[in-house]
C-alpha cells in the first residue's frame, strides 16, 4: 500500500514553507510524522530543490545515535550547509537531543535555512524551549488517521462506510496498521509494541516509575471509563477497593505522564451559561480506540463512548479546543471553540430513532439559549436533513468525511 497522503498536515507545511519561522509537528509515536516529512520532501524535490539542499535526521534511527549530543548535531548540520543555497532542515523526533533548542536557535537566525521539527510528547516543547523560541515557531498537533483518511486509503476495497468504521475503531487508525489488515496477530503485536514503547519507554523512564503494574491498572481504568467524569481521587479509591492501594498524588502524577505522552487527552468542563472553565472532574479520551481494544477486548459493550471518542478526536483535528459542556442540569458532550472564541455544541448518540432517546439527547442543546450552532451526531441514516428548533441532526459518518 503506498504512503497515505495527509493533506491537512501537508497544507500546514506548505503554508509556512520558506517563512522565517520554525515548523513544529507534535504527535504520538507512529502517527505519521516521519511519513509526512517524506511526502513534503518529495514535493520539494519535484519543485527543483536538490537532494543536497535537504538535511533530514531521524533520531529514532541508530545511524544518527551519535548526534543525540547537541554539539555533535551542530557540527553535523553545519558541515552540510551550502551558504549560497536555500537549505531545508528536518529534525525528526528531536526530543532525543537534550538542549536541542540551542542548535535550532543557532540555525534559525541564518537566513537561508528553513527548519522543520517533530516530537512525540508534550514535554519536548518544554518551558525552556518555548521561552527561547517564543514568537519563532508555529505548531500543529498530528493525530493518527482520521476516518476520512482511512476511507480514502480503502477507496478500492469495495467495503461500505459502516464496515470501514467498524474496522477503524477495532483495528486502529495508525498508518502502519493499514499494511496488516488481514493479519490479526500482526496488528496485535504492532499495537502491543507501540503501547509498550509509549508507556514503558516514554512514561516509565521519564517519571522513574517502579510500579509498572499500577500504571497499567490506571490505564485500564481510564480505558474502561472513556467519556466518563473521573478524577485522581475516584481512580485511587477504585483501585484501592480492588486491592491496589494508591494515593491521589501518585495517580495524578501518572495521569500527567499519560497525557504528556499524547496517549490520553484531558477534556475540561466548560460552564455553558457563564462561558468559563470549571475546576471539576474532567473526561478522558484516548488517541486511538485500538489501544482500548488491545487491553479491554469487548469493545462492543461501549459503542456509544467509542463513537464519542472518534468525534472528540475529529474536532481536535479540525483545530477546535474541545470541552465538556456543563449545564445547571445535565451536560453537553462537547463544546468546540474555534480560534476567536466562536462556539459550536455537539451531542453524540449512536441512535435517536427511539423518541425517548431523541428527546433526552436534544434536551441539553435546547437548554442553551445563545445563537451558536448546535449539532446532534448519530449513526442513523438520514434521507433528508433533520432540524429540531435550530438543532441540526447529521449522520456522523457524513460529518466525519466532511459531507
Question: Can you describe what each PLM-predicted range is?
Answer:
Residues 82-100:
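Conserved P-loop NTPase "ATPase switch" module shared by AAA+ and STAND
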Residues 120-122, 127-229, 265:
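Interdomain motor-coupling "hinge/lid" segment immediately C-terminal to the ATP-binding subdomain
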Residues 25:
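Hydrophobic anchor at the beta1->P-loop junction of P-loop NTPases
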Residues 34:
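Walker A/P-loop
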Residues 381-403:
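Domain-level recognition of nuclease-like catalytic cores that cleave nucleotide substrates
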Residues 3-18:
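Pre-Walker A adenine-sensing motif
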Residues 182-342:
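Accessory nucleic acid-recognition modules appended to NTPase machines
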Residues 55-84:
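Short glycine-rich substrate-engagement loop in P-loop NTPases that contacts/grips substrate
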Amino acid at each position: 500500500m503506498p504512503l497515505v497522503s495527509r493533506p491537512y498536515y501537508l497544507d500546514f507545511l506548505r503554508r509556512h514553507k520558506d517563512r522565517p519561522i520554525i515548523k513544529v509537528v507534535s504527535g504520538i509515536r507512529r502517527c505519521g510524522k516521519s511519513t509526512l516529512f517524506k511526502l513534503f520532501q518529495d514535493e520539494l524535490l519535484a519543485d527543483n530543490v536538490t537532494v543536497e539542499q535537504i538535511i533530514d535526521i531521524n533520531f529514532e534511527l541508530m545511524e544518527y545515535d551519535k548526534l543525540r549530543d547537541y554539539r555533535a548535531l551542530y557540527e553535523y548540520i553545519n558541515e552540510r550547509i551550502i551558504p549560497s543555497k536555500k537549505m531545508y532542515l528536518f529534525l525528526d523526533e528531536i526530543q532525543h537531543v537534550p538542549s536541542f533548542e540551542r542548535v535550532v536557535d543557532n540555525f534559525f537566525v541564518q537566513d537561508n535555512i528553513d527548519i522543520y521539527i517533530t516530537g512525540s510528547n508534550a514535554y519536548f516543547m518544554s518551558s525552556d524551549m518555548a521561552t527561547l523560541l517564543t514568537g519563532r515557531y508555529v505548531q500543529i498537533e498530528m493525530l493518527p488517521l482520521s476516518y476520512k483518511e482511512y476511507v480514502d486509503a480503502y477507496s478500492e476495497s469495495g467495503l461500505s462506510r459502516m464496515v470501514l468504521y467498524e474496522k477503524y475503531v477495532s483495528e486502529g487508525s495508525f498508518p502502519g496498521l493499514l499494511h496488516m489488515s488481514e493479519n490479526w496477530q500482526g496488528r496485535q503485536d504492532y499495537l502491543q509494541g507501540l503501547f509498550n514503547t509509549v508507556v514503558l519507554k516514554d512514561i516509565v523512564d521519564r517519571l522513574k516509575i517502579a510500579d509498572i503494574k499500577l500504571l497499567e491498572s490506571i490505564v485500564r481504568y481510564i480505558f474502561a471509563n472513556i467519556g466518563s467524569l473521573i478524577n485522581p481521587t475516584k481512580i485511587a479509591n477504585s483501585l484501592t477497593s480492588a486491592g491496589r492501594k494508591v494515593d491521589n498524588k501518585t495517580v495524578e502524577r501518572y495521569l500527567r505522564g499519560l497525557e504528556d505522552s499524547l496517549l490520553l487527552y484531558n477534556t475540561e468542563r466548560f460552564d455553558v451559561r457563564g462561558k468559563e472553565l470549571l475546576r471539576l472532574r474532567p473526561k478522558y479520551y484516548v488517541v486511538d480506540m485500538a489501544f482500548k481494544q488491545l487491553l479491554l477486548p469487548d469493545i462492543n459493550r461501549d459503542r456509544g463512548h467509542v463513537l464519542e471518542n472518534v468525534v472528540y478526536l475529529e474536532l481536535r483535528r479540525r483545530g477546535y479546543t474541545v470541552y465538556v459542556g456543563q449545564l445547571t442540569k445535565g451536560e453537553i458532550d462537547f463544546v468546540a471553540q474555534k480560534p476567536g472564541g466562536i462556539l459550536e455544541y455537539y451531542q453524540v448518540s449512536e441512535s435517536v430513532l427511539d423518541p425517548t432517546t431523541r428527546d433526552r439527547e436534544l434536551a441539553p442543546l435546547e437548554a442553551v439559549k445563545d445563537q451558536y450552532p448546535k449539532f446532534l451526531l448519530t449513526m442513523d441514516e438520514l434521507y433528508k436533513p433533520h432540524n429540531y428548533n435550530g438543532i441540526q441532526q447529521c449522520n456522523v459518518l457524513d460529518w466525519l468525511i466532511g459531507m
